[in-house]
Structure formats: structure tokens, C-alpha cells
Amino acid sequence: MLFRSRAALVRRETIRLIEIAGNGHYSSVFSCAELMGALYSGVMRIAEDPEWPERDRLILSKGHVAVGLYPLLAERGYFPADWLDSYTRLGSPLGDHPDMRRIPGVDFSSGSLGHGLSIGVGMAKAARLRGYDETRVWVLLGDQELNEGQIWEAAGSASHFGLGNLCAIVDANQMGLDGTTEETMSVEPIGARFAAFGWDVVELDGHDPAAILTQAAALPATTGAKPQCIVARTVKGNGVSYMELSRTWHIGWLSPDDAAAAVVEIDQRG
């Protein structure tokens, strides 16, 4: 499956699964659909066995986008595809937030914002101690959670320990539940902040497949001494025109007719 097709898969299945659940985080998923699609299009070192010890790890610090991750894990065969139809149902392993104890391919249970980078630091340090020289730990962050002080404690720790096997990706969509980051509390300049903590930083268009894949391929070896940060400039709700730049769809539910129309637009845009 091509890279763009994976991003479209994430969006289509997010709409379908939220229709099953009754509500969910459409626009937060849509802003990082290309980013998640890229990670599962050859960027991460993963295998058929989701428990392979030397695999890359992915921490969804913005755990409320798990509904977009599940179709990618099912596509890889980590769990049966019919699990998707049970999303958020009583007894289902697939909840609003990812559960590492119940879902193959999930590397850490997340949900409360601000914790993911600290977890990533611990995993990157553990990989070094175990001699997993090619293992990289990826952390997908939302921009508004950068207001959590724990993020910057982790950023300082990563630099101090020389964790060149850690890469943070910031989904900089500039919008959260309460409004834009400028209205609530600015987190800019994101790149300069990470650089001040000793990270290598690059900014790119988070909806440009070529830019994402090119930058991922250009990352320094995991044996390096500087952690990496990719600031991905994205649009909240990207892929469905009436959701773009609207906080209305941070969490919500589409009627069946609106859901069908959204899927048509996703397919047309590719």
C-alpha cells in the first residue's frame, strides 16, 4: 500500500470507527495521518513479530489519536482486522486510548498528555543499555501538550544522556480543544526551544509525503549523541474541508450522511 493510501486509510477508518463508538477525535487524527502513515511505510524498523526486542518503538504521547493507529496495526497483521469493529465496545481491547497490555504493536499505554517524551527517554536509554544499537524510539507529541513542564524535563534529560536514538515528532497543528495555541498559551518557537535543550531540529510540512520520508531517511545514526526533533507543521482536520482549522471537530460525531460525504472527499483528495 502506498504512503498516501495509508494516510487515507487512517482517515477513512477513523470516520468509520468513531461512527461505531458514537464520538471521537476526528481532527486530531487527521492532522497527523501522514505522519503515522509514514512511520508504518518503512520508516520504523519493525517486523512481523510485534514483540521483536530490537524493534523501533512508537509512543503516542497524544494518545487520543489511537483510533488512527489501530487500522495501521491491523494492516500489519498484529491483530485480527475484525477487532476494529469492536472499537470501544464493552470488553474490546481497542479503547479511546492505547493499551499496551491488550493490543499487540502498542508500545506504551498513553492518554494523559505530557508523559510520552519521558517514557521515550526511558526506552531510548534502555535500548542503549541493552546494546540495541539500531533501535530508535519515536514519540508523537501534540503542540499544546508542550505546555506541560514534564516535556521540558524530558527534553533536558534526553540531551544530557546523549540519546541520539530518540526522535520527537511534534504535530504542530496550532489548535486544541479550547482554541488556538495563540489564544490559550503559545508554545512557539517550538524548534528554538528544543534546540536550546541541545536537540537537532528540522521543520517540515507534515502533510507532504516526500518531505516526511526524505527527512526520516536523513536522520543521523541512532548511535549519535543528539536527540532529534521534527516539527511538523500541520492543519487540524486536514483532509475534510469543513473540519480544517475548526475546533468543533476536536471531539464529536458525524451523522451517517456526513460521514459518507467526508469519505468521498478523502478519496478524492487521496
Regions found by a protein language model. Give the residues of each.
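N-terminal capping segment at the start of a domain
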Residues: 7-23, 171-173
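Flexible, glycine/charged-enriched surface loops at secondary-structure junctions
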Residues: 26, 84, 227-229
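Glycine-rich beta-alpha junction loops
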Residues: 34, 64-65, 69, 173-174, ...
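Glycine/aspartate-rich loop-and-adjacent alpha/beta segment that forms the canonical ThDP
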Residues: 209, 213-270
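Short, small-residue-biased leader/transition segments that mark boundaries at the very start
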Residues: 1-2
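Thiamine diphosphate
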Residues: 105, 109-222
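Short secondary-structure boundary/capping segments
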Residues: 76, 184, 244-248
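Cofactor-binding active-site loop characterized by glycine-rich and histidine/acidic residues
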Residues: 14-17, 29-160
